[in-house]
From Swiss-Prot:
The keyword Glycosyltransferase applies. The modification Phosphotyrosine is found at Y204, Y227, Y473. This is Glycogen phosphorylase, muscle form. It comes from Macaca fascicularis (Crab-eating macaque). Belongs to the glycogen phosphorylase family. It catalyses: [(1->4)-alpha-D-glucosyl](n) + phosphate = [(1->4)-alpha-D-glucosyl](n-1) + alpha-D-glucose 1-phosphate. AMP binds at D43, Y76, R310, R311, F312, K313, S314, S315, K316, F317, G318, C319.
Length: 842
């Protein structure tokens, strides 16, 4: 029998380190050991750092699975209305740290790995990003999944398990080069294959009309096999599911050829079926009408709807029948949210199932479909709107085309009855667009087939009602809503900026993590010298850490005391990275003109990927790197100005750069950025914003107060007026000497001496066909940047403004966004109730 502990020995257990929970740490170490040996079949003599990462991932995952099973059992028992979020993109990033944060395991895992002689941060860096998205739309879906779990909604994310996610960007000779993102090379410890739920998806074939109704026959079948990933809520023991579909060829695929000796070819041709989820299309805000992309869109929709209906039929429903056969209650038990038009085929597919397979009459089926579906619009750029050629649909999905024609006919009959004699309105509102190539307008299909249509920021939702969807708003104003986007504070504050989260928690407690409006309490600390000092200190630490990262990974040296001026987002003309470039060159010219004058030192960092086929976006990257080559090697400039292109911008890099930012660039032409979410991440992490009155910037400035925001440039009305008058870049070129100098430098090869005409396409675009009016905002932008520099010279005032921004960023939590979707679109009530943990009695 061991001797009892002395009082002093007992007291030694009271320590900060002890907070991890000693039995927890011991248990984690034991499980880590078990997974290393029994799951990975390695010992310490041959284990690599990657093996240690996998062992840790499996150890953490063990804490998810009990909660995951318990959550699904809870949903089966309670049979709540289920929310299905359909998206072609889920830009999840890394999972390990997020899971530890949401399960309150971070301290214990840190201690356990430390005791095992490992560095948890190094292990976290080994994980590949799940890059199954291009940018904002896919990342929004990921934030929404986190919030739906945190709010206790019975929600499921449905998408595609792409074998290759968004390409890895390499910069070579100043140009973007794309490399395949082989994110599954070493396996994915977070997913669970579910081959037992494999479902058939049909393509091609033709339609037979019988006395029983329409039959789609002689189709090619591809099997959809689901992979499930757990999505934990924040410390509430809820774990929801993201189900991503992969493709398999059926066993008899093309084997009729076998009899004539084509066995080998038939087996090789299985690849054609399995190509569907091979790669994410890397276009952001651009529609490319490729057959494979249409196959992807139908593939996810067809598999998901079968799954939804299977779950609906087999759920508890207070009746003795083995399955539910009555679809009257379907819209009361199922909500389908379409993330943009990419999953729009859900509307005709649900109609096909109800009418052709469930033998429901058209009007009833249509009522069920409309009450079930809702559509989120993400862009007003005409080149981004999906318009599928009829000939493609006719070949690939002949029955769906017939259903779309029928939907259109009935819809136009309603329009004609409401607006008699208005023929042009019928043409404008038709789902079918006539022209050289007949097309189906998928946004029109979504509006007709949904009970709710929403934009993603107040100004964007207003633009939808006044411009591109004006006719539809006049027909059915009750359908149109706004749901301003948000971000999850778990990943975008607690995980990426623990120093700031801690400083905040010391003042107002930890409840803000799942109730971000509580940040308002920080307004009473705006004049608190200790708090001002703490916030500034955390920012400086983050800047030093990021500077060290750049030095380590890219051998790039930057001045950590300079103003970190950051623009990170997809490279696109409408986001106006070119305006940023013009400012950088202007600043450079000013330093060269007055080398002895004091300039606030700046490090301008720009990052983002260009679509591989987008010539102008790739030229913009080449320009940024060329400016950097000149500026960074000019001894006159020294440490006062640096230009860095951040290679391969992705979720895991944004988690490093955003907490280090001083200035956030949100400078799209007013009326073009639907919302933006990067803007919110910077605001929450203590950067100030320079931006136009566009997207969510408008609401951010409203929350913080315009005096705490660097607003510049034309408003939407000004852009409209300029369009009416006719935008003439030459006017600005002639009138503004500094602008003229910059353009002359670009034209003359100042930044490309070996190839003087390298940037002629950029100059030509800016001078003659710039849809996004860069010159019109140049002067105001430069003046606004001068105000930024002036304030940065006063660190106390700068930090006070930062605190006001952080304190008013609560509105931009995705928890608020999702609570609004739940109440106003899905008809469900969010719940903060904690489920019992797996080791607790129910």
């Amino acid at each position: 029998m061991s001797r009892p502990l002395s009082d002093q020995e007992k007291r030694k257990q009271i320590s900060v380190r002890g907070l991890a929970g000693v039995e927890n740490v011991t248990e984690l170490k034991k499980n880590f050991n078990r997974h290393l040996h029994f799951t990975l079949v390695k010992d310490r003599n041959v284990a690599t750092p990657r093996d240690y990462y996998f062992a840790l991932a499996h150890t953490v995952r063990d804490h998810l699975v009990g909660r995951w099973i318990r959550t699904q059992q809870h949903y089966y028992e309670k049979d709540p209305k289920r929310i299905y979020y359909l998206s072609l993109e889920f830009y999840m990033g890394r999972t390990l740290q997020n899971t530890m944060v949401n399960l309150a395991l971070e301290n214990a895992c840190d201690e356990a790995t430390y005791q095992l002689g490992l560095d948890m941060e190094e292990l976290e860096e080994i994980e590949e990003d799940a890059g199954l998205g291009n940018g904002g739309l896919g990342r929004l879906a990921a934030c929404f999944l986190d919030s739906m779990a945190t709010l206790g909604l019975a929600a499921y994310g449905y998408g595609i398990r792409y074998e290759f996610g968004i390409f890895n960007q390499k910069i070579s000779g100043g140009w973007q080069m794309e490399e395949a993102d082989v994110w599954l090379r070493y396996g994915n410890p977070w997913e669970k294959a579910r081959p037992e739920f494999t479902l058939p998806v049909h393509f091609y074939g033709h339609v037979e009309h019988t006395s029983q109704g329409a039959k789609w026959v002689d189709t090619q079948v591809v099997l959809a096999m689901p992979y499930d990933t757990p999505v934990p809520g924040y410390r509430n023991n809820v774990v929801n599911t993201m189900r991503l579909w992969s493709a398999k060829a059926p066993n008899d695929f093309n084997l009729k050829d076998f009899n004539v000796g084509g066995y080998i070819q038939a087996v090789l041709d299985r690849n054609l079926a399995e190509n569907i989820p091979r790669v994410l299309y890397p276009n952001d805000n651009f529609f490319e009408g490729k057959e494979l992309r249409l196959k992807q869109e139908y593939f996810v929709v067809a598999a998901t709807l079968q799954d939804i209906i299977r779950r609906f039929k087999s759920s508890k429903f207070g009746c003795r029948d083995p399955v539910r056969t009555n679809f009257d209650a379907f819209p009361d038990k199922v909500a389908i949210q379409l993330n943009d038009t990419h999953p729009s085929l859900a509307i005709p597919e649900l109609m096909r199932i109800l009418v052709d397979l469930e033998r429901m009459d058209w009007d009833k089926a249509w009522d069920v479909t409309v009450r079930t579906c809702a559509y989120t619009n993400h862009t007003v750029l005409p080149e981004a709107l999906e318009r599928w050629p009829v000939h493609l649909l006719e070949t690939l999905l002949p029955r769906h085309l017939q259903i779309i024609y029928e939907i259109n006919q009935r819809f136009l009959n309603r329009v004609a009855a409401t607006f008699p004699g208005d023929v042009d309105r019928l043409r404008r509102m038709s789902l079918v667009e006539e022209g050289a190539v007949k097309r189906i307008n998928m946004a029109h299909l979504c509006i007709a087939g949904s009970h709710a249509v929403n934009g993603v920021a107040r100004i964007h939702s207003e633009i939808l009602k006044k411009t591109i969807f004006k006719d539809f708003y006049e027909l059915e104003p009750h359908k149109f809503q706004n749901k301003t986007n948000g971000i999850t504070p778990r990943r975008w504050l607690v995980l990426c900026n623990p120093g700031l989260a801690e400083v905040i928690a010391e003042r107002i407690g930890e409840d803000f993590i799942s109730d971000l409006d509580q940040l308002r309490k920080l307004l009473s600390f705006v004049d608190d010298e200790a708090f001002i000092r703490d916030v500034a200190k955390v920012k400086q630490e983050n800047k030093l850490k990021f500077a060290a990262y750049l030095e380590r990974e890219y051998k790039v040296h930057i001045n950590p005391n300079s103003l970190f001026d950051i623009q990170v987002k997809r490279i696109h003309e409408y986001k106006r990275q070119l305006l940023n470039c013009l400012h950088v060159i202007t600043l450079y010219n000013r330093i060269k003109r007055e080398p002895n004058k004091f300039f606030v030192p700046r490090t301008v960092m720009i990052g983002g990927k260009a679509a591989p086929g987008h010539h102008m976006a790739k030229m913009i990257i080449r320009l940024i790197t060329a400016i950097g080559d000149v500026v960074n090697h000019d001894p006159t400039v020294g440490d006062r100005l640096r230009v860095i292109f951040l290679e391969n911008y992705r979720v895991s890099l944004s988690e490093k750069v955003i907490p280090a930012a001083d200035l956030s660039e949100q400078i799209s032409t007013a009326g073009t950025e639907a919302s933006g979410t990067g803007n919110m991440k910077f605001m929450l992490n203590g950067a100030l914003t320079i931006g136009t009155m566009d997207g969510a910037n408008v609401e951010m400035a409203e929350e913080a107060g315009e005096e705490n925001f660097f607003i510049f440039g034309m408003r939407v009305e000004d852009v409209d007026k300029l369009d009416q008058r006719g935008y003439n870049a030459q006017e600005y070129y002639d009138r503004i000497p500094e602008l003229r100098q910059v353009i002359e430098q670009l034209s003359s090869g100042f930044f490309s001496p070996k190839q003087p005409d390298l940037f002629k396409d950029i100059v030509n675009m800016l001078m003659h066909h710039d849809r996004f009016k860069v010159f019109a905002d140049y002067e105001d932008y430069i003046k606004c940047q001068e105000k930024v520099s002036a304030l940065y010279k006063n660190p106390r005032e700068w930090t006070r403004m930062v605190i006001r921004n952080i304190a008013t960023s609560g509105k931009f939590s995705s928890d608020r966004t999702i609570a609004q979707y739940a109440r106003e679109i899905w008809g469900v009530e969010p719940s903060r109730q904690r489920l019992p943990a797996p080791d607790e009695a129910i």
